[in-house]
Amino acid sequence: MDKKQVTDLRSELLDSRFGAKSISTIAESKRFPLHEMRDDVAFQIINDELYLDGNARQNLATFCQTWDDDNVHKLMDLSINKNWIDKEEYPQSAAIDLRCVNMVADLWHAPAPKNGQAVGTNTIGSSEACMLGGMAMKWRWRKRMEAAGKPTNKPNLVCGPVQICWHKFARYWDVELREIPMRPGQLFMDPKRMIEACDENTIGVVPTFGVTYTGNYEFPQPLHDALDKFQADTGIDIDMHIDAASGGFLAPFVAPDIVWDFRLPRVKSISASGHKFGLAPLGCGWVIWRDEEALPQELVFNVDYLGGQIGTFAINFSRPAGQVIAQYYEFLRLGREGYTKVQNASYQVAAYLADEIAKLGPYEFICTGRPDEGIPAVCFKLKDGEDPGYTLYDLSERLRLRGWQVPAFTLGGEATDIVVMRIMCRRGFEMDFAELLLEDYKASLKYLSDHPKLQGIAQQNSFKHT
């Protein structure tokens, strides 16, 4: 071994990570690295880069959970190498999955299953759950049309202002999306416009129980009743799928009198995010069908499980089982009582913010975060004809300088001239944290007032509604 090799070896063994040779070069980003490096150095490089991400706890744009207790981290670590799709190899994880399906079905008032096991599945998130619910709708509709001897080449789906996953579903599965556009004073699907869009080629109607733009509920019951009348008048029977990405784990606990779920006979399936208000870590969603008849069997694949067969219906395959296991932990840990307390706390924060922000400017509130109105979100716009000397984009940009990610964006459809600001209140965004946001909000308003030349220059460049 020559002197240089000895020096290099000594460096690798003894040098501190910030004195190591491998940290004195820029990390590879375009080509696969040629050489190995010390694990502590590789970790340090990546760890330092992650500091440039936003602080997840201050992200008030996301609907997703940004706080998990230590036990969730432990369970995720224990499950990192358990493959969710391998039911035979990990039977207890599979059993936990089935228990969660039963619990969610019970929460949403699904009819008691004939064999004791509810019909549903875990997914990577509510978007995959929507895809599966949409596929089942299309297959059921196609079967009915074929039985009636009618063509099946022009399916359509009727919805209000939906999350982009429904646009993807329509494109991927060749379905015409008839989206009822937002318009001033009418920001979600109403029965009249819904019925005008329906015909015998409608595979289903999809209300969003927690509209992503504003946080308001698109209440399913009036739409359901209108479809009953439509069937009585035309003979056309149309199913419903409820996209309850956020509301599915809120209303059962804080607004149980809202009839939105399987209590409505036309509702054949419901999807929701476990990793939003289900309180699970990222990567967990659920879709539940009313019964076995609502899920066409040709979409189900059977895999080995405990010496027998179990049906699976999913788009994704290999992924860790930790998210499902963590969801089960939250169900056991909190129960109905605990979920009610956690969700009520978020609504209390939303109500407090709405009351305080209303005092600070000429705002018109679209959602004030009341349990009977929608999810715990505060959404507002500047009142028509008012010019406070700043835009909501300016305000969003100033708050970002303090780490707060509070989006300002335009609405969709025929309301693209309306700019709103939306604040999501979730577990971990407690009252004291909300008070700190208000202090920075007031400081931002003062800064904009003191620097009028800076007003109106910020653009919608920090948030894209998807």
Swiss-Prot record:
The gene is gadB. This is Glutamate decarboxylase beta. Its EC number is 4.1.1.15. Disulfide bonds: none annotated. Induction: By acidic conditions. Expression is regulated by a complex system involving RpoS, cAMP, CRP, EvgAS, H-NS, GadE, GadW and GadX. The level of involvement for each regulator varies depending upon the growth phase and the medium. The modification N6-(pyridoxal phosphate)lysine is found at K276. Belongs to the group II decarboxylase family. It comes from Escherichia coli O6:H1 (strain CFT073 / ATCC 700928 / UPEC). Its cofactor is pyridoxal 5'-phosphate. One of its GO terms (cellular component) is cytosol.
